[in-house]
């Protein structure tokens, strides 16, 4: 995600990137006479995850007799996003590229439709996550293939010892490492969450929930809003602010929660919550297993006390923050047939499981049929800690992305501008009344719609 940048900004910056960017050394599989193919993938933060794609690439290249090159580009300084912008502007570069959640919309007219490939994948693996579909389709056509590598959920990673000691909640009993709900799971809602947040705050181990303008903050607040049925617009983009009791209730709950968080959460970035958990100062964060994975290395005494559970439910159900990657094929690419073949290969169950294993369970396949990989049962310590990380039927939950059901073009602006956390901050930090904050929100949305 390009924080605070619109497409014009990205294109301008991207033009400069082609001359000055430094990429990791590419992996080249020179196999034969099937032509050349070059892909740019997100440079995975988990050690070994890139190697999983390299192994898969070698297997496919040998079978297909294609000269395949894989580049891995990180998102530090938005390098990957700017690379995509530069290539779209120049109409040359890789044949395919990893695209963040909202990037498909920026380049839809320059991406090859992949409806034929998606139909084959669905016929084999079943339905694709609806959020991935919402983001990857434009004007009824699939413009990218939902990816496994890098795709993440953001459920609750809980210090089960601290939660039980200070809030009286046994999260391992509530959500065991089995496909079943335990005692207390049915009452794991935002009211229970608020009470636990207050108790852990009083004990000096507050929940580590960012409230600023980075993705971790926008994502968890987005899931909270959806669980209250609190939409800022309808599916056509018309504001639904006035007389919206559900939106008021959701904002009120978020304001109440914020009172029991660290004072500086309004300035936290996406690493701050990780650091809070790893340091032992926090009893709960909403995150993929990234913080836990680092704790296994740097603070094993913390990692051994962590347990992943679904997000709390609200009056309209339980929603899990979900952030998918998509792989697009440029329409100006020279080997689009081979590109589709390669993406079909790495979308198989066997390939998805290989990348998920190498990521320590971090990666989430886009197909619900793949939520049963053994890696989530066996990763530890403690063994079973991430069993409930992927969405499972007994969670009775829905994957979500903030600001749906707004049209993707508008939702992406609302997301990048973090309008959900900003409106909360105006009440919780700015001293505004609910009516004042909602009036500001409606004006901002109307300005975005006018362009």
List where the protein language model places each region.
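Conserved N-terminal structural module of periplasmic/extracytoplasmic solute-binding proteins
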Residues: 2-108, 119-126, 151, 169-176, ...
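C-terminal lobe and pocket-closing loops
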Residues: 290-303, 315-419, 450
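Paired acidic/hydrophobic, glycine-rich loop segments that form the ligand-binding mouth/hinge
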Residues: 95-98, 283-287
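Short helix-initiation/N-cap motifs at beta->coil->alpha
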Residues: 73-83, 187-192, 265-278
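Glycine-centered hinge/linker elements that transmit conformational signals in sensory
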Residues: 191-200, 236-267, 311
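Hinge/lid segment of periplasmic solute-binding proteins
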Residues: 100-157, 161, 305-312, 384-392
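Extracytoplasmic/periplasmic solute-binding protein
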Residues: 138-150, 154-156, 184-239, 246, ...
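Short, solvent-exposed loop/beta-turn-alpha elements that line the ligand-binding surface or hinge
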Residues: 116-129, 134, 172-186, 228-249, ...
